[in-house]
Amino acid sequence: MEAAADGPAETQSPVQKDSPAKTQSPAQDTSIMSRNNADTGRVLALPEHKKKRKGNLPAESVKILRDWMYKHRFKAYPSEEEKQMLSEKTNLSLLQISNWFINARRRILPDMLQQHRNDPIIGHKTGKDAHATHLQSTEASVPAKSGPSGPDNVQSLPLWPLPKGQMSREKQPDPESAPSQKLTGIAQPKKKVKVSITSPSSPELVSPEEYADFSSFLLLVDAAVQRAAELELEKKQEPNP
């Protein structure tokens, strides 16, 4: 009886010892699995969190910055005052604006410039503007070279006859010349007549300083007159015989 009593006790003891371990193992497995899933969820959630931190700028702010860059596409380097102005318009910090321009100059600006070159309407407008500026520069330079000449600028014509070819070239009127130039061309012969009328042998123009020969002649005349006066004095002083 004791052996039988001991037998069941011995047979029951392993069951009692093993049963708690078997009943606890599924709970431990589930807890471990839940912990692993939580860890993996955290690991997977990290990139999304980083993406949210890196997030894109607001669309309205980006539009304002792109418009400014397109207007200043040939010199897309805003000054500190312009950055401050853009910061007030876009509600972004100066650091965000600086970083956006650094990236936009590498990624967005080349496409803007290429689109500007390939656009036929913009290219046609720029061509017209360049042609208009060229015409304005030429029109501004022409009056400086061939403006209306005053009386001081009119050159007197030579008194000797000109060759036939030169006379024919001067007689032919220039179709592009202004009326003021035609008037000066008509006034030139009048000046020629005035020059030819003036007599070069007027007494006012003749002076001993201009002609050295006349000065020596005058000296001889003075010496002769002085000698004649001396002879007359000698005759008067001599006693009569």
UniProtKB/Swiss-Prot annotation:
**InterPro entries with a match to the protein in the record:** HD (IPR001356), Homeodomain-like_sf (IPR009057), KN_HD (IPR008422), TALE_homeobox (IPR050224)
What GO annotations for molecular function exist for this entry?
DNA binding; DNA-binding transcription repressor activity, RNA polymerase II-specific
Q: Which domain of life is it from?
A: Eukaryota
Annotated DNA-binding residue span(s): 48-111
Q: Which UniProt keywords apply?
A: DNA-binding, Homeobox, Nucleus, Transcription, Transcription regulation
Entry keyword annotation includes Kinase: no
PROSITE patterns in alphabetical order: HOMEOBOX_2
Q: Where is this region: Disordered?
A: 1-58, 125-207
The Polar residues compositionally biased stretches are 10-39
Query: Which protein family is it in?
Result: Belongs to the TALE/TGIF homeobox family.
Summarizing the function annotation, the protein's role is: May have a transcription role in testis.
Q: What is this protein called?
A: Homeobox protein TGIF2LX
Native organism taxonomy:
Eukaryota, Metazoa, Chordata, Craniata, Vertebrata
